[in-house]
């Protein structure tokens, strides 16, 4: 026999899950108190980072039903929601979202809804990649360097090159500049083959 669970999440400590519990009960779902999982955590946290949700996942079995009042209870964004619903569906768990009319997200109508959500998730991901790429291009155009700051500045690199030309050992130069031999060898290589 299938069991019914509810997941109620609130973001701040001054909120309660009472409204969500009432909404679930008003929709006709009778859920045992021990099968209502409540969590006080930010909605920006992915479901994988939610301890209460992870405890719920460990308890759910094939044939069980999960009730949420809103879709955002299942993830922090469209991609996370899609991943969560897919994970639950693969396990054989039916997911009902009351904000979508109590629709079972694993039913044909629910699957269509999830395809729309998947399209939105893909669109979100593409926008994020596009913004990231344009931000990197803009930063590089403004002369922004990426990665760690160089160990040696240009003046120090010239001194290193002069020391190498005068026969000082790589190890001695590395000790003088308090850096590794590899850093000195990289500086030497760059000065011998300047950027074209």
Curated annotation (Swiss-Prot):
One of its GO terms (biological process) is DNA integration. Pfam families: HTH_7, Resolvase. It comes from Escherichia coli (strain K12). InterPro entries: Homeodomain-like_sf (IPR009057), Recombinase_CS (IPR006118), Resolv_N (IPR006119), Resolvase-like_N_sf (IPR036162), Resolvase_HTH_dom (IPR006120), SSR_resolvase (IPR050639). This is Serine recombinase PinR. The keyword Ligase applies. The active site is at residue 11. Its EC number is 3.1.22.-, 6.5.1.-. Residues 3-143 form the Resolvase/invertase-type recombinase catalytic domain.
